[in-house]
């Protein structure tokens, strides 16, 4: 039995892991992929103490910091659900993905408390599972995924040197995507369904200096076209008239959806599916904490996620001390 299981692999999980190691807890971090949304970020210039870095570098520094404390990180684990047992402990069931070491390490069924087997048993749990990209849900999107449609500019942008591409969205992620693509592609269209951007002014100002970027406002993307690969996209203007752009890449950045489906059904969530937490980062179930973008805390920022991870861990320590 672990004192604590931390589920996730980005800023919140990293901060929680560092503090857990310093408190000498018996714990483990389990995650599908380490790095999370941080690893898919482009330039990062608002992480205190580092004037400028990028997501890949910062994610590696997170990993290095955890490694320096000897923290056990198990990757390739896809958590199915968390259940609180009658004795107050938590049963986590999961499936092993590629690279996971958990395959074949099932614990016996807890006959008096649960009919299901537990892959991990812990006194407390921190959920720091983050978010995943929201989809457009339009014709052509699924058909051309990984064939020109991408949700990660950092990952796939370098595959389009000298090409004509489009970024769809109206927030920071879309602006950052366009800025990155402007240095790679021949032409970048930025498709914003709104009359203005919701992102940071400094990003928009930088984007407006790029000669190969064209911003199209009040444009709702209706379908993505192509043959074997993407060849274009169609959008409707505010009058409903359709226009087609010839592009070879479409980068979708229209927001995120919280990865909150693994928590017990009795856990309170808001209308967006975000886990509701109190000032101690605890859910409405004692011993179950949540941190980072998966929660209802506003302003989704790396530094805020790290702070929440710290808060969740220290709160979990207080909970564990009371259990003794």
What are the language-model segments listed below?
Residues 137, 143-159, 252-304, 308-311, ...:
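FAD-site-proximal beta/loop scaffold in flavoenzymes
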Residues 66-98, 119-122, 183-279, 318-324:
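A Rossmann-like FAD-binding core segment of flavoenzymes
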Residues 44, 59, 66, 135, ...:
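A general structural signal for well-ordered alpha-helical segments in protein cores
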Residues 2-71, 173-200, 270, 315:
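Beta1-alpha1 glycine-rich phosphate/pyrophosphate-binding loop at the start
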Residues 1-7, 22-25, 236, 243-249, ...:
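Rossmann-like nucleotide/phosphate-binding core characteristic of flavoprotein oxidoreductases
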Residues 1-7, 35, 39, 73-163, ...:
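FAD-binding core/adjacent interface of flavoenzyme oxidoreductases
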Residues 10-12, 131-133, 171-173, 296:
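Residue-level detector of alpha-helix initiation sites
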């Amino acid at each position: 039995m672990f004192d604590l299981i931390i589920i996730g692999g980005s800023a919140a999980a990293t901060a929680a892991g560092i503090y857990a190691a310093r408190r000498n807890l018996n714990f483990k971090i389990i995650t599908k992929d380490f790095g999370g949304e941080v690893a898919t970020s482009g330039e990062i210039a608002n992480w205190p103490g580092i004037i400028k870095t990028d997501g890949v570098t910062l994610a590696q520094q997170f990993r290095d910091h955890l490694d320096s404390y000897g923290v056990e990180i198990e990757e390739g684990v896809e958590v199915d659900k968390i259940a609180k047992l009658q004795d107050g402990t938590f049963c986590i069931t999961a499936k092993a993905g590629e690279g996971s070491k958990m395959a074949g390490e099932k614990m016996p069924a807890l006959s008096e408390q649960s009919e299901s087997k537990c892959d991990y048993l812990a006194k407390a749990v921190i959920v720091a599972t983050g978010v995943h990209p929201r989809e457009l849900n339009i014709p052509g999107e699924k058909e051309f995924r990984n064939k020109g449609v991408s949700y990660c500019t950092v990952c796939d942008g370098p595959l389009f040197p000298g090409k004509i591409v489009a970024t769809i969205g109206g927030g920071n992620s879309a602006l950052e995507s366009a800025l990155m693509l402007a240095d790679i592609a021949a032409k970048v269209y930025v498709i914003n369904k709104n009359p203005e951007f919701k992102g940071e002014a400094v990003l928009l100002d930088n984007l407006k200096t790029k000669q190969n970027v064209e911003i199209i406002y009040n444009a709702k993307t209706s379908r993505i076209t192509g043959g074997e690969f993407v060849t274009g996209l169609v959008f409707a203007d505010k009058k409903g008239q359709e226009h087609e752009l010839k592009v070879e890449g479409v980068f979708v950045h229209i927001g995120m959806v919280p990865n909150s489906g693994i928590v017990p059904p009795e856990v309170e969530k808001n209308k967006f599916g975000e886990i509701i937490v109190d000032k101690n980062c605890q859910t409405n179930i004692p011993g179950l904490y949540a941190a980072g973008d998966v929660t209802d805390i506003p302003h989704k920022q790396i530094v805020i996620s790290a702070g929440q991870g710290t808060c969740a861990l220290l709160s979990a320590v207080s909970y564990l001390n009371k259990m003794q």
